[in-house]
From Swiss-Prot:
The protein's name: DNA ligase
UniProt GO MF annotations: DNA binding; DNA ligase (NAD+) activity; metal ion binding
Signal peptide stretch: none
Task of the protein: DNA ligase that catalyzes the formation of phosphodiester linkages between 5'-phosphoryl and 3'-hydroxyl groups in double-stranded DNA using NAD as a coenzyme and as the energy source for the reaction. It is essential for DNA replication and repair of damaged DNA.
Binding annotation for Zn(2+): C422, C425, C440, C446
Cofactor: Mg(2+); Mn(2+)
Gene, per the UniProt record: ligA
Family assignment from sequence similarity: Belongs to the NAD-dependent DNA ligase family. LigA subfamily.
Catalytic activity reported: NAD(+) + (deoxyribonucleotide)n-3'-hydroxyl + 5'-phospho-(deoxyribonucleotide)m = (deoxyribonucleotide)n+m + AMP + beta-nicotinamide D-nucleotide
Species of provenance: Shewanella sp. (strain W3-18-1)
Alphabetized Gene3D superfamilies for the sequence: 5' to 3' exonuclease, C-terminal subdomain, 6.20.10.30, BRCT domain, DNA ligase/mRNA capping enzyme, Helix hairpin bin, Nucleic acid-binding proteins
C-alpha cells in the first residue's frame, strides 16, 4: 500500500467491510516487514514508512476493534499486568546439555558418538547466554510460550514473548505443520544491555549485573509493557513437538533450522556444519577469538550431530541428549585477597566454608564470596586467611577459588579452622567416614534445617497435610508458632488466623487437615523424617522389612544393609539419624501428639505376585495418580525404577510416552498401557 492511498482510505467514510480488508492487509504487510528486518536483515522500507503503516493500523483498530486479529503487530504488548505466572507442562521435555570443558572432553564425547553410529558431521552454533524458551504455533499463529523451568513444567510467558519483535506472531507462508513447537534462546544483545543500564543509571536505579540476568528478569515481568521496553532478541535452535507426525521435516538439524528460518523465525548467522573433528575445533577457536566482538553474550558453542536419524539412534539419557554437547569456553580468572571464612549451614545440615573475598570483577560480575566446599578442598588448595587467590567463574556462573599465589602469602596468614559445633544450634559437627561434607548433627532440632525439614514433613509424599504449603510453613516458623514437626499438631484454628491471608474458614480447614494427617503409614512417617538419602522407595522397604518403628530405631548398620536396596552408606545415615538424641525427642513428641499408623502384617507370597520384578512408569496416566500407581506396584512386590534398562521387566506407558518407551522397545522390554495396569490391580485386590 502506498502512503497516499492510506491517507485517502483513513480520511474517507470507510465501511466496516473495507476496514476489515485494509486492517488484514496492513497486519500482513507489517508482519512481513518485521521478518525482513529482524530475520532476513534486508528491510525494503524505511523506519519512517514502517511507523506510518503502524499508525494507520492503530487508528483503524481504535475505530473498528471488532476486527483486531491475534497476529496484529499492535498486539505484541498486552493490557493489564498479570498477578502471577501460570504453569505450563511441556509437550516434550526440555532437556539440558552435558558440558565439555576442553578438547579431551569433546574428543571423548565424539568417540562415544562414533562408536555408536559411525562417522558423523556436526551442526555447530554459538551457545547463547540467555533463557531457554518454548514457543508453540498452532495453524501458524503463536499460541503460547513458556520458560524451560525444570524441563517438565515451565512458566507461561506468552504475553512477554509476543513483545520480542524478532519473533513472528504468525509464521510466514502456508507450508508449515498444523502444530509446531519452536525452541530457542531469548537474550539481550550487548547494545540493549548497555542502553538499559544507562537508563537505570540516569534514574539512580539498581544496575543489572549482566545481559543474561537482564534477559531473565525482563522475561519474568508480570507487566509485558516492561518487557517490551527491554529490547530482547531471540534465536531459534531446535524443533520440539511437530504435528502431524507425517509432516516432512529436514533430514538434518541444519535443514530443520533453515525450515524455521523460511517460516520467519530468526536463526543465528554463526551456524556451521563441520564434517571433520579438526573443523569442529577450528570453529570453537574461531568463535572464542571473536567472542568479544559478537553482538551478544555467549559462554561456549553447541555441537549437535547433524543427521536426525543418527540423533534418534543415539537417544537420550535422563537429563540430556546423547547427540549434543555444550563445549564451554574457559572461565575468566582474576586474583584477589581472601579476607576471611564464614561457615554456613544448609537445609540438609551440610556445613560449608564460604570465602569472604576482596571484591573483584571477573566474568562480567563483581565477586565477593566463593564456596570452599569442604575441609578436603581447603587442604588441597593449602589455603589460609590472608592469601592471594585466583578466582574463576566456573562455567561463567559459579565463583570458584582454583589456586593460591604462594609467593604473596603474608606472615600474618592464619589457618582456616573448621568448627566443632554448629554455628547455628551448637550441636556437634560430624563427618562420617568416606564423606567429604561435615554436617550438623542437630537434625530436626537445628534452626538452619528447620524450615526445609518441616516443609518436607508436611509435603504431599510425606504426611500430606493439605493446605500446608511452603509459605504457610515459613510464616509459622517466623511467627514462632512452630519450632519442630510435633508443634504442627498443637496448632489450633484460632492460632493460625494470625497468619497472613488466613481467615477462620481456611484456618479451620487446615486444622482439620493437620488432625487427619495424624493417621498415616510407617513408610510415609519414615520418609517425612527427612533422613538423608531415604526416599519413598527406601522408606517403604525399611517399613516392610522391620514392620515397626521400635525395631528400626535399634537396628545396626549390618541389619539395615539386609534391607532391599539399602547399601552401607544409606544404612549409616539411618543408624546415625536414630543415634541422635535430638531426633529421638522429635519422634517421641510426634507419637505423643497422636501420630500413628496401622500395624504392618507380613505379606504372603500370593499377595506379592510381582516380587523380584522391576517396573517403570512413563507418560501421563489419566485414571491413576502416578504416586498411587507406584505404591500399588510396590504393594504387589515390584521395585519401581526411574529408568529403563536390560533389567526392567515391564514398562507402563501412559500418554505422550517418550524416550523410555523407545528404549523399552529397543531392548525388547514388555510394555503395557494404563488399562492393563488397572486390570492387574483389579485382579489382585
Amino acid at each position: 500500500m502506498q502512503d497516499i492511498q492510506l491517507d485517502k482510505l483513513l480520511s474517507a467514510d470507510m465501511s466496516p467491510e473495507n476496514a476489515q480488508q485494509v486492517m488484514q492487509a496492513l497486519s500482513q504487510s507489517l508482519n512481513e516487514h518485521n521478518i525482513r528486518y529482524y530475520v532476513d536483515d534486508a528491510p525494503t522500507i524505511t523506519d519512517s514508512e514502517y511507523d506510518r503503516l503502524m499508525q494507520c493500523l492503530i487508528k483503524l483498530e481504535a475505530q473498528f476493534p471488532q476486527f483486531i486479529v491475534a497476529d496484529s503487530p499492535t498486539q505484541r504488548v498486552g493490557g493489564l499486568a498479570l498477578a502471577k505466572f501460570d504453569q505450563i507442562t511441556h509437550l516434550k521435555p526440555m532437556l539440558s546439555l552435558d558440558n565439555a570443558f576442553g578438547e579431551a572432553d569433546f574428543s571423548a564425547f565424539h568417540k562415544r558418538v562414533t562408536d555408536k553410529v559411525g562417522e558423523v558431521s556436526f551442526c555447530c552454533e554459538p551457545k547463547l547466554d540467555g533463557l531457554a524458551v518454548s514457543i508453540l504455533y498452532r495453524h501458524g499463529v503463536l499460541e503460547r510460550a513458556a520458560t524451560r523451568g525444570d524441563g517438565t513444567v515451565g512458566e507461561d510467558i506468552t504475553e512477554n514473548v509476543k513483545t520480542i519483535k524478532s519473533i513472528p506472531l504468525k509464521l510466514r507462508g502456508n507450508d508449515f505443520p498444523e502444530v509446531v513447537e519452536v525452541r530457542g534462546e531469548a537474550f539481550m544483545p550487548k547494545a540493549a544491555f548497555e542502553a538499559l543500564n544507562e537508563r537505570a543509571r540516569a534514574k539512580d536505579e539498581k544496575l543489572f549485573v549482566n545481559p543474561r540476568n537482564a534477559a531473565a528478569g525482563s522475561l519474568r515481568q508480570l507487566d509485558s509493557k516492561i518487557t517490551a521496553s527491554r529490547s530482547l532478541a531471540f534465536y531459534a535452535y531446535a524443533l520440539g513437538v511437530v504435528e502431524p507426525d507425517s509432516y516432512s521435516l529436514g533430514k538434518t538439524h541444519y535443514e530443520q533450522l533453515q525450515q524455521l528460518k523460511s517460516w520467519g523465525l530468526p536463526v543465528s548467522n554463526e551456524i556451521k556444519v563441520c564434517e571433520e573433528l579438526d573443523q569442529v575445533f577450528d570453529y570453537y577457536k574461531d568463535i572464542l577469538t571473536r567472542r568479544s566482538d559478537l553482538p551478544f553474550e555467549i559462554d561456549g558453542v553447541v555441537m549437535k550431530v547433524n543427521d536426525i536419524a543418527q540423533q534418534q539412534r543415539l537417544g537420550f539419557v535422563a537429563k540430556s541428549p546423547r547427540w549434543a554437547i555444550a563445549y564451554k569456553f574457559p572461565a575468566q580468572e582474576e586474583m584477589t585477597l581472601l579476607e576471611g571464612v564464614d561457615f554456613q549451614v544448609g537445609r540438609t545440615g551440610a556445613v560449608t566454608p564460604v570465602a569472604r573475598l576482596k571484591p573483584v570483577f571477573v566474568g562480567g560480575v563483581t565477586v565477593s564470596n566463593a564456596t570452599l566446599h569442604n575441609a578436603d578442598e581447603i587442604e588441597r588448595l593449602g589455603i589460609k586467611i590472608g592469601d592471594t587467590v585466583i578466582i574463576r567463574r566456573a562455567g561463567d556462573v559459579i565463583p570458584q577459588i582454583v589456586a593460591i599465589v604462594p609467593e604473596r602469602r603474608p606472615e600474618t596468614a592464619t589457618d582456616i579452622v573448621f568448627p566443632h559445633n554448629c554455628p547455628v544450634c551448637g550441636s556437634l559437627v560430624e563427618r562420617l567416614e568416606g564423606e567429604a561434607v561435615a554436617r550438623c548433627s542437630g537434625g530436626l532440632f537445628c534452626e538452619a534445617q528447620r524450615k526445609e525439614a518441616i516443609k518436607h514433613f508436611a509435603s504431599r509424599k510425606a504426611l500430606d497435610i493439605d493446605g500446608m504449603g511452603d509459605k504457610v510453613v515459613e510464616q509459622l516458623i517466623d511467627k514462632e508458632l512452630v519450632q519442630s514437626p510435633a508443634d504442627l499438631f498443637k496448632l489450633t484454628a484460632s492460632m493460625m488466623t494470625m497468619l497472613d491471608r488466613m481467615g477462620m474458614k481456611s484456618a479451620t480447614n487446615l486444622a482439620a487437615a493437620i488432625e487427619a494427617a495424624k493417621t498415616t503409614t510407617l513408610a510415609r512417617f519414615l520418609y517425612a523424617l527427612g533422613i538423608r538419602e531415604v526416599g519413598e522407595a527406601t522408606a517403604a522397604n525399611l517399613a516392610a522389612h522391620f514392620a515397626s518403628l521400635d525395631a528400626l530405631r535399634v537396628a545396626t548398620v549390618e541389619q539395615l544393609t539386609a534391607v532391599e536396596d539399602v547399601g552401607v552408606v544409606v544404612a549409616q545415615h539411618v543408624a546415625h539419624f536414630f543415634a541422635q538424641p535430638h531426633n529421638l525427642e522429635v519422634i517421641d513428641a510426634l507419637i505423643a501428639a497422636g501420630v500413628h499408623w496401622p500395624a504392618i502384617e507380613a505379606p504372603s507370597a500370593d499377595a506379592q505376585p510381582l516380587k523380584g520384578q522391576t517396573w517403570v512408569l512413563t507418560g501421563t496416566l489419566n485414571q491413576l495418580n502416578r504416586n498411587d500407581a507406584k505404591a500399588q506396584l510396590q504393594t504387589l512386590g515390584a521395585k519401581v525404577a526411574g529408568s529403563v534398562s536390560k533389567n526392567t521387566d515391564c514398562l507402563v506407558a501412559g500418554e505422550a510416552a517418550g524416550s523410555k518407551l523407545a528404549k523399552a522397545q529397543e531392548l525388547g522390554v514388555k510394555v503395557i498401557d494404563e488399562e492393563a495396569l488397572l486390570a492387574l490391580f483389579a485382579a489382585n485386590r
